[in-house]
């Protein structure tokens, strides 16, 4: 797939252009320099042509926190991209930072570079000011307004004009990484991807955007989503943190799996419980990762079991969730995490024959009969699997409205155990035996 990077100094509108092209607010936009500090990826389309769009941190000459790391991110993006959109601002004019960016881009002569002059909504169309931008040496400029949508079509025409061999998209398994600030989420992403894709530091909340990264492992395609650290709501003061909190919820909503990262070197706190609650609410598989295991003090053969016991008590609503101990910074026990991810992926794709399911539930009813109600006893006489993000089963019975939640929980736990679905949640729907059901899988 064609890859397109948007590059420029801070505050020229890179994230606004990125959002305009992909038509959603994926990158956090604000007036503060460097608010987009990692490179953000998204799929985009123009005139039936698909391409991958990359937003980057801004390059600038002045001394500035994260300057060197942002420059490294931009260089990664430039190396990776087939087309580079060099964005400058008509409103602010050209300065040394723009020439600095141009100097870097000229080193990449094999790349297609498109100069886009943003914030040009006030420009007179009859003005002859192209020469100021032609000095950069990148053919004719495209005058646009990302905020107002002016000139975007012409720029996109030039982007998709680049010819590349089509690569067939494969099914990808998406998992997001969530946790409070500074528990090592970005270090874990870098460890998995074997590159400094994310800006990492010991300053809490270095990562503010949700960032998608595609990679292959064992011939399977994955998408990993790293998110901003979740603070307690009372501490969410800046707009940026509010946006990031919403982005975490959005990331969860488009994931197949949630990786909850805890800091093993500190006591688990209320924030960790709130984050685990988000995972529970989503009702999709999750894995609890205890990171920084390398710096946990006074470990012995019982330490891990003590941690597991504490986690099971604190997060009792995630009793089925696997727990993995690792050190992202030391690249230790990462394979343990991937073994769990692969197992969950396989379990989510399992399909079960209706006869097997019905026989299983009959046996469970024989072992533990449904409780009586004023009209008699409930009897489940048929079970089938239907489409769902997690294994979803419909149980047909008489008077389902009288089924007690404790018996439903008994069935859920026993079905999960009997079918080997110990590391994923399942959903049970109880329907009247006369109801029709949609989305039923064909039995094999």
From Swiss-Prot:
Record-listed GTP 2 binding positions: 179-186, 226-230, 291-294
PROSITE patterns: G_ENGA
Residues annotated as binding GTP 1: 8-15, 55-59, 118-121
GO biological process, one term: ribosome biogenesis
Chain ranges of the EngA-type G domain: 2-167, 173-349
Record has Nucleotide-binding as a keyword: yes
CDD domains: EngA1, EngA2
Keywords: GTP-binding, Nucleotide-binding, Repeat, Ribosome biogenesis
Domain KH-like span(s) in chain numbering: 350-434
Molecular-function annotations in GO: GTP binding; ribosome binding
Record InterPro entries: G_ENGA (IPR031166), GTP-bd (IPR006073), GTPase_Der (IPR016484), KH_dom-like (IPR032859), KH_dom-like_a/b (IPR015946), P-loop_NTPase (IPR027417), Small_GTP-bd (IPR005225)
Purpose of the protein: GTPase that plays an essential role in the late steps of ribosome biogenesis.
UniProt subunit comment: Associates with the 50S ribosomal subunit.
PANTHER family named among the record's database cross-references: GTPASE DER
HAMAP family: GTPase_Der
Recorded family membership: Belongs to the TRAFAC class TrmE-Era-EngA-EngB-Septin-like GTPase superfamily. EngA (Der) GTPase family.
Protein name, entry field: GTPase Der
Origin species: Malacoplasma penetrans (strain HF-2)
